């Protein structure tokens, strides 16, 4: 995600339309910031899941992993889709890195269970009575 965000920011700075970089458009700057926020949310949740790896309660570990997987999946999808939009047609060509990054982020979203699977798993772990939470 970080590489795709950096590639997108660089593209916004160098691609010119009507003689000015498209990155000078405030709307595109906001989209870039939204991508950065999603990236940082994913990093934070991954760090949280890593910290919870030492938690003695297996239910709490599973909750942390599922929560991280949901956030990483959502962030990956958002960053990938936004990058493709900001790059325009070149964003999905085989010759350009952005398309490859987007495909990889899509694959990551479905590794070890989909985002939806982990959202349901998290909800079940959170709402199940304590004697059923194993």
Q: Where are these predicted regions, by residue range?
A:
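Alpha-helical interface subdomain recognition
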Residues: 1-134
């Amino acid at each position: 995600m970080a590489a795709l965000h950096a590639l997108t920011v660089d593209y916004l700075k160098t691609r010119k339309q009507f003689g000015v970089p498209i990155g000078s458009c405030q709307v595109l700057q906001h989209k870039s910031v939204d991508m950065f926020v999603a990236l940082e949310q994913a990093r934070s949740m991954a760090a949280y899941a890593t910290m919870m790896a030492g938690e003695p309660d297996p239910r709490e570990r599973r909750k942390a992993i599922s929560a991280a997987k949901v956030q990483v999946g959502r962030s990956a999808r958002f960053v990938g889709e936004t990058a493709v939009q900001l790059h325009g047609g070149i964003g999905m060509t085989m010759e350009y890195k952005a398309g490859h990054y987007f495909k990889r982020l899509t694959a990551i979203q479905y590794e070890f269970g989909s985002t939806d699977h982990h959202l349901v798993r998290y909800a079940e772990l959170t709402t199940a009575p304590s004697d059923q939470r194993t």
